[in-house]
From Swiss-Prot:
Homohexamer. Allosterically activated by N-acetylglucosamine 6-phosphate (GlcNAc6P). It comes from the Bacteria. InterPro entries: Glc/Gal-6P_isomerase (IPR006148), Glucosamine6P_isomerase (IPR004547), Glucosamine6P_isomerase_CS (IPR018321), NagB/RpiA_transferase-like (IPR037171). It comes from Erwinia tasmaniensis (strain DSM 17950 / CFBP 7177 / CIP 109463 / NCPPB 4357 / Et1/99). This is Glucosamine-6-phosphate deaminase. The gene is nagB.
C-alpha cells in the first residue's frame, strides 16, 4: 500500500486529480479502448473534482473516451432530487467536462428489480474488462462506498442498510434532518473494488483518523472496510495532516520519505 501524506484537503484533491490525469493520458484511451474510472460522491472528493475540471479546461486531459462507474446511490430518492448521486455527479463534475452521457454509469436506486439492477451493473463492469482506477472516500467508521462495518470482503454490488451513524453524517446534505436521509442504498461491493486495477482512497480531517490508522497500521478486518486495501496490489491512500493524528510518527515519516518525489510541487 502507498500512503501519500499531505497537509490540506486541497493538496489531497490536487494530488488525486493529477494522478487520474496522468493515468488517463498514459493509457491513451480511444473509443474502442476507453479508460474505465470508478468515482465516489460526498464531501471529500469535491476538491479532486474541482482540480479535474480545471485541468480539463486547461487542455491537460479529455474525458471523451473515459467510461465511469459510480460507487453507490440512495434507494428511493428521485434521480432529480438535489442530493441524489446522479444530481451530485452532474452538478460537481460531469456537466463541466467533455464526457459522453453514454459513458456515464450510475446505479438506479429506483429500479423495479433491485437485484437485477445490481447484477447488470456488475456485468457491465465485466464487459469492459475491469475498472482501471477506482477513486473513493472513507467514512468515519472506515466504510468505503456504502460497505458498512462487517461487510463481506468478497461482496459484490447489492443493496445495503445504512447505519444510523452514516445517516447522521450524511444528514448535513439534507438540512440536518436525519429522517430525510434514505435508509437504504445500492453500492458496489468490497470485492468489486478489489477487482479494480488500482484503488485510490482519499482521507481528510481528524474525524477519519481512526479509520486511517486501521487501514495502515491495523489488521485486515471486516469491521474496518478500508483495511481491505492491504489486500490490493495497487492500493493508494491520499490523506491530509489531520487524518494522520492516530498514526505513529515513524509511520508518517516513513511514507513521507518514500513519497518525497511524488508530493513535491503541490
Amino acid at each position: 500500500m502507498r500512503l501519500i501524506p499531505l497537509l490540506t484537503p486541497d493538496q489531497v484533491g490536487k494530488w488525486a486529480a493529477r494522478h487520474i490525469v496522468n493515468r488517463i493520458n498514459a493509457f491513451k484511451p480511444t473509443a474502442d479502448r476507453p479508460f474505465v474510472l470508478g468515482l465516489p460522491t460526498g464531501g471529500t472528493p469535491l476538491e479532486a473534482y474541482k482540480h479535474l475540471i480545471d485541468m480539463h479546461k486547461a487542455g491537460q486531459v479529455s474525458f471523451k473516451h473515459v467510461v465511469t462507474f459510480n460507487m453507490d446511490e440512495y434507494v428511493g430518492l428521485p434521480t432529480e432530487h438535489p442530493e441524489s448521486y446522479h444530481s451530485f455527479m452532474h452538478r460537481n463534475f460531469f456537466d463541466h467536462v467533455d464526457i459522453s452521457s453514454e459513458n456515464i454509469n450510475l446505479l438506479n436506486g429506483n429500479a423495479a428489480d433491485i437485484d437485477a439492477e445490481c447484477h447488470q451493473y456488475e456485468e457491465k463492469i465485466r464487459a469492459y474488462g475491469k475498472i482501471h482506477l477506482f477513486m473513493g472516500g472513507v467514512g468515519n467508521d472506515g466504510h468505503i462506498a456504502f460497505n458498512e462495518p462487517a461487510s463481506s470482503l468478497a461482496s459484490r454490488t447489492r443493496i445495503k442498510t445504512l447505519t444510523h451513524d452514516t445517516r447522521i453524517a450524511n444528514s448535513r446534505f439534507f438540512g440536518g434532518d436525519v429522517n430525510q436521509v434514505p435508509k437504504y442504498a445500492l453500492t458496489v461491493g468490497v470485492g468489486t473494488l478489489l477487482d479494480a486495477e488500482e484503488v485510490m482512497i482519499l482521507v481528510t480531517g481528524h474525524l477519519k483518523a481512526q479509520a486511517l490508522q486501521a487501514a495502515v497500521e491495523g489488521n485486515v478486518n471486516h469491521m474496518w472496510t478500508i483495511s481491505c486495501l492491504q489486500l490490493h496490489a495497487k492500493g493508494i491512500v491520499v490523506c491530509d495532516e489531520p487524518a494522520t493524528m492516530e498514526l505513529k510518527m515513524k509511520t508518517v515519516k516513513y511514507f513521507r520519505e518514500m513519497e518525497a518525489e511524488n508530493i513535491k510541487h503541490l
